[in-house]
């Protein structure tokens, strides 16, 4: 009821706040026998963690995950997997000036009105720090999906502010601090971010995530359509203000003759639908994009109100990301993995004995 869990058969529940003692999560429904250890999760956590480059927040958290339960002798037992990450670099004093002040564009005001109080230190539960546990849980799902079913999930930053990736060289994504697939734009990105930090402002971004090897048939019409659950999961990431599946909002200007993905025995001719038809996976790559707003934690003064309703000026102090989209890449991968894992287990539970006589087709 309180919105801290996602999934039906593969259930992830997270807990913890930005400046609390620790973050944690419980994973229910992971099949037994999966070879798993902390290192499997640490790789993605290191991709997400703060302080890894000059383009992200200066907060330095090692984000070292500890397994509390559910793994014995290097394999999952089928019972609840408990994970924890300690917070070690809190500087709560940086937030003392907003104890009774609402930051525009943040959840300060809405949390106060909903709960009657709020943890103002780093945003408390509303902080993107919480997503560390989603990434850890997503890493578990990613390993199972790849090892058992050959499904791979890859995300990248497709646009930062006005700078768009014009080339998609997936071998370059992990070779730069931006997770950017177009190496010809890296110098431009560096210069743009340097100027942005000097100005004390922030900027939005577009993150893309692609899942390949997904079988036909995942998705539960009508209210648990695969694309609906993916959109729900991605929209639940902090700062996300829009989600696209496939061509997304570009379909507004497309004609039916242009948008439909023609089929032949050799496969689909295109993938405008993003790998999902009628809420069910088609066997093509699943493609999703998220639009992330620029963070409101900037040093440029802005008008707001106090908890007493009085007008006040806000100048945000502390350590913040000038573009939250950079560290969102592994988060988007994790959320897509969690949804696919959940739907794979649900499909297996109901449809494992289905044997369609229609040949399976892929991309031409």
Curated annotation (Swiss-Prot):
GO terms assigned for molecular function: chorismate synthase activity; FMN binding
Cofactor note: Reduced FMN (FMNH(2)).
PROSITE patterns recorded: CHORISMATE_SYNTHASE_1, CHORISMATE_SYNTHASE_2, CHORISMATE_SYNTHASE_3
Keywords of this entry: Amino-acid biosynthesis, Aromatic amino acid biosynthesis, FAD, Flavoprotein, FMN, Lyase, NADP
Binding-site residues, FMN: 125-127, 238-239, 278, 293-297, 319
Listed EC numbers: 4.2.3.5
Reaction equations catalysed: 5-O-(1-carboxyvinyl)-3-phosphoshikimate = chorismate + phosphate
Requisite cofactors: FMNH2
Record-linked InterPro entries: Chorismate_synth (IPR000453), Chorismate_synth_AroC_sf (IPR035904), Chorismate_synthase_CS (IPR020541)
Pfam families named among the record's database cross-references: Chorismate_synt
Binding locations of NADP(+): 48, 54
Pathway annotation: Metabolic intermediate biosynthesis; chorismate biosynthesis; chorismate from D-erythrose 4-phosphate and phosphoenolpyruvate: step 7/7
GO cellular component: cytosol
CDD domains xrefs: Chorismate_synthase
Gene Ontology biological process terms from the UniProt entry: amino acid biosynthetic process; aromatic amino acid family biosynthetic process; chorismate biosynthetic process
Subunit structure: Homotetramer.
Family recorded in the similarity comment: Belongs to the chorismate synthase family.
Described function: This reaction introduces a second double bond into the aromatic ring system.
Protein name, UniProt field: Chorismate synthase
């Amino acid at each position: 009821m309180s919105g801290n869990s996602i999934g039906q058969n593969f259930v992830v529940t997270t807990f913890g706040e930005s400046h609390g003692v620790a973050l944690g999560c419980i994973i229910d429904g992971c099949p037994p026998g999966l070879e798993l250890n902390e290192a499997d999760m640490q790789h993605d956590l290191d991709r997400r963690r703060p302080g890894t480059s000059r383009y992200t927040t200066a907060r330095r958290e090692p984000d070292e995950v500890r397994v509390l339960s559910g793994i014995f002798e290097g394999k999952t037992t089928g019972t609840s997997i408990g994970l924890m990450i300690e917070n070690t670099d809190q500087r709560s004093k940086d937030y003392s000036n907003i104890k009774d002040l609402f930051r525009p564009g943040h959840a300060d005001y809405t949390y106060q009105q909903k709960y009657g109080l709020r943890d103002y230190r780093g945003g408390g539960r509303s902080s993107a720090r919480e997503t560390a546990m989603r990434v850890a849980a997503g890493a578990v799902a990613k390993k199972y999906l790849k090892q058992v079913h050959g499904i791979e999930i890859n995300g990248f930053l497709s646009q930062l502010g006005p700078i768009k990736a014009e080339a998609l060289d997936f071998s370059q994504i992990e070779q730069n601090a931006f997770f950017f697939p177009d190496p010809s734009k890296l110098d431009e990105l560096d210069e743009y971010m340097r100027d942005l930090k000097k100005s004390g402002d922030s900027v939005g971004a577009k993150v893309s995530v692609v899942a390949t090897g997904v079988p036909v048939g995942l998705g539960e019409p009508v209210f648990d359509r695969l694309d609906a659950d993916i959109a729900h999961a991605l929209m639940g990431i902090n700062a996300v203000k829009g989600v696209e599946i496939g061509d997304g909002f570009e379909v507004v200007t497309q004609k039916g003759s242009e948008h439909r993905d023609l089929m032949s025995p050799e496969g689909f001719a295109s993938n405008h639908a993003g790998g999902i038809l009628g809420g069910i996976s088609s066997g093509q790559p699943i493609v999703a994009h998220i639009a992330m707003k620029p963070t409101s934690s900037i040093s440029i003064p802005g008008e707001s109100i106090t908890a007493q309703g009085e007008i006040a000026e806000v100048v945000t102090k502390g350590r913040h990301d000038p573009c939250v989209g950079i560290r969102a890449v592994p988060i988007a991968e994790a959320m897509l993995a969690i949804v696919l894992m959940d739907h794979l287990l649900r499909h297996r539970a109901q449809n494992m004995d289905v044997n369609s006589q229609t040949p399976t087709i892929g991309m031409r």
